[in-house]
Design a protein with these regions (language model features):
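Catalytic core of soluble alpha/beta enzymes
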Residues: 167-299, 308
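Conserved, mostly hydrophobic/aromatic
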Residues: 3, 42, 68, 107, ...
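N-terminal small/glycine-rich loop or linker at the start of catalytic domains
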Residues: 118-142, 180, 189
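Metal- or metallocofactor-binding catalytic centers and their adjacent structured scaffolds
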Residues: 5, 38-118
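Active-site mouth loops of central-metabolism enzymes
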Residues: 133-149, 198-203, 246
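N-terminal basic, low-complexity leaders that serve as flexible interaction/assembly modules and, when applicable
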Residues: 1-70, 357-365
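Flexible C-terminal active-site loop/helix
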Residues: 1-15, 27, 32, 299-365
Length: 365
């Protein structure tokens, strides 16, 4: 399967409501960068990545077009792992994460999609999965929601079939966070899983104080309590805070995950396939977690990552993220009784409506 064309496209997708967290502030749109790989035999694979507020979207598209497309054209598309290594070392001096990992992710996802399509299997089954069902939670991006808005969102999530919900914390006043988490637990009762996400808002000491204050509300995990670079800080929060820690959406290499896992700084490693370099390194993170008897969860791009968790023996929850593409997909992800179901369509099964997306094409800068 010789690669003939690597087509990159960049879109700016408006959000139906303004979302908010403690780091990125208010978000009205996100960037979507897609890659379509066309082979000489007519086969095609699709990959994509995304960025908050479309920061970096044009740079990712440019990197794909100027560096990765010329590197890949003429190569055998079935050699997925070796092509990943080639991209990694080609971009190593300026990469090792950052926008390079986003660009590599879009390509790697497209190659795995192509590989599964050629084999005639859905991606989850191609990767060795037996059951397409994965426990899922609704990821609220709701830090500035009023309590009434938070309750309305929660009712909507429950009505949509979710049996686990994540909310944002990290307001200026810790007392407000406690009040909101207490209210959420009251609405949910004891049987619905509740997670809280601080988006790196706190120092280590502040995170420990927050974890201790939130401990009475039976959180499944506290996510990103501090900056991802502070590995020892994460370990200390895990030891002293009393709540399991989830982290990883801002870790863009396998090596960063290995350090955090080895240090005891995370109970739920949380790779995002769209920013860690794709499926190839995502699977390596899942194996590293399994070796330490840890479950792996996800961040973002749920339509892709449902396949990965369905094929992973140490799978935890799938995040169903607010940056969804449902309106551009004829068959969005199905949620029933708290479980997401990976589709049985060949490849990853994401079939985008390119005509609808066309009106959101980003201008070239």
């Amino acid at each position: 399967m010789t690669i003939e064309v690597v087509q990159a496209d960049h879109f700016r997708i408006p959000l139906p409501v303004v979302l908010s967290d403690s780091t990125h502030g208010e978000m009205s749109h996100f960037g979507l960068v897609t890659v379509r790989i066309h082979c000489a035999n007519g086969q095609q694979g699709l990959g994509y990545t995304y960025c908050v507020g479309d920061i970096g979207g044009d740079a990712i598209r440019s990197l794909l077009e100027r560096e990765l497309a010329p590197l890949l054209i003429g190569s055998d598309a079935s050699a997925v792992e070796s092509l990943w290594e080639r991209m990694w070392w080609h971009l190593h001096f300026v990469g090792r994460g950052g926008i390079a990992a986003f660009a590599m992710a879009a390509v790697d996802i497209a190659l795995w999609d192509l590989r599964a399509r050629v084999d005639g299997k859905p991606l989850w089954r191609f990767l060795g999965g037996e059951d397409p069902h994965v426990a899922a939670y609704a990821g609220g991006i709701d830090l500035q929601f009023t309590l009434a808005e938070l309750e309305a969102q929660t009712r909507g999530f429950l009505d949509a079939g979710f049996r686990a919900i994540k909310m944002k914390v990290g307001r200026d006043d810790l007392g407000e966070d406690v009040e909101r988490v207490k209210a959420m637990r009251g609405w949910l009762g004891p049987d619905i899983a509740l997670m809280a996400d601080a988006n790196m808002r706190w120092s280590v000491d502040e995170a420990i104080d927050a974890a201790r204050a939130l401990r009475p509300y039976d959180l499944t995990w506290l996510e990103e309590p501090t900056i991802p670079d502070d590995v020892e800080g994460h370990a200390r929060i895990a030891r002293e805070g009393g709540i399991p820690i989830a982290s990883g959406e801002n870790l863009h290499t396998v090596y960063e995950f290995q350090r955090l896992i080895t240090a005891g700084g995370v109970a739920f490693p949380e790779p995002d396939v769209a920013n860690i370099g794709g499926i190839t390194p995502w699977l390596a993170v899942a194996r590293a977690a399994q070796a330490k008897n840890l479950p792996v969860t996800t961040h973002g791009v749920h339509d892709l990552q449902v396949h990965l968790l369905a094929a992973t023996p140490n799978a935890s929850y799938l995040e169903v993220h607010g940056f969804g593409l449902d309106r551009f997909m004829p068959e969005p992800l199905v949620i029933e009784e708290g479980m997401a179901r990976a589709p049985n369509r060949v490849g990853h099964g994401v079939d985008l409506d390119w005509e609808s997306l066309a009106s959101h094409r980003a201008p070239r800068e």
